[in-house]
């Protein structure tokens, strides 16, 4: 299924690109989230009329993400959790807990936190990536201490 991208999508393309994707991905994710429209002649024509507006909106979102990234750059956040004698946590610290800790200073969504190794299960210092925009990723330090 061919779609016209209205926003930059990782591994697909940028604004205005025509991409071939599976129908389920288009119907269930791209189109409902307003990241793409079906690639018809009418939609291609209307997109060309709106291209400047969409590119300006994308640049505005990226600038806002870069401003948020500057406030997060080099920051250290601390989370206290119940832990055993050897530093193993009772439970784990996931994206929601990290987003709540960071949100005390900068508004961050749970979906923007990247934990490639999964939830944190030990005390210590961890580097956590926060993806504020598809092109803006900032790394913060997370200190997990025993309560």
From Swiss-Prot:
<dbReference type="InterPro" id="IPR020069">
    <property type="entry name" value="Ribosomal_bL9_C"/>
</dbReference>
<dbReference type="GO" id="GO:0006412">
    <property type="term" value="P:translation"/>
</dbReference>
<dbReference type="Pfam" id="PF01281">
    <property type="entry name" value="Ribosomal_L9_N"/>
</dbReference>
<dbReference type="InterPro" id="IPR020070">
    <property type="entry name" value="Ribosomal_bL9_N"/>
</dbReference>
<comment type="function">
    <text>Binds to the 23S rRNA.</text>
</comment>
<dbReference type="Pfam" id="PF03948">
    <property type="entry name" value="Ribosomal_L9_C"/>
</dbReference>
<keyword id="KW-0699">rRNA-binding</keyword>
<dbReference type="GO" id="GO:1990904">
    <property type="term" value="C:ribonucleoprotein complex"/>
</dbReference>
<dbReference type="InterPro" id="IPR020594">
    <property type="entry name" value="Ribosomal_bL9_bac/chp"/>
</dbReference>
<dbReference type="InterPro" id="IPR036935">
    <property type="entry name" value="Ribosomal_bL9_N_sf"/>
</dbReference>
<keyword id="KW-0694">RNA-binding</keyword>
<dbReference type="InterPro" id="IPR036791">
    <property type="entry name" value="Ribosomal_bL9_C_sf"/>
</dbReference>
<dbReference type="GO" id="GO:0005840">
    <property type="term" value="C:ribosome"/>
</dbReference>
<dbReference type="InterPro" id="IPR000244">
    <property type="entry name" value="Ribosomal_bL9"/>
</dbReference>
<keyword id="KW-0687">Ribonucleoprotein</keyword>
<comment type="similarity">
    <text>Belongs to the bacterial ribosomal protein bL9 family.</text>
</comment>
<dbReference type="GO" id="GO:0019843">
    <property type="term" value="F:rRNA binding"/>
</dbReference>
<keyword id="KW-0689">Ribosomal protein</keyword>
<dbReference type="InterPro" id="IPR009027">
    <property type="entry name" value="Ribosomal_bL9/RNase_H1_N"/>
</dbReference>
<dbReference type="GO" id="GO:0003735">
    <property type="term" value="F:structural constituent of ribosome"/>
</dbReference>
<protein>
    <recommendedName>
        <fullName>Large ribosomal subunit protein bL9</fullName>
    </recommendedName>
</protein>
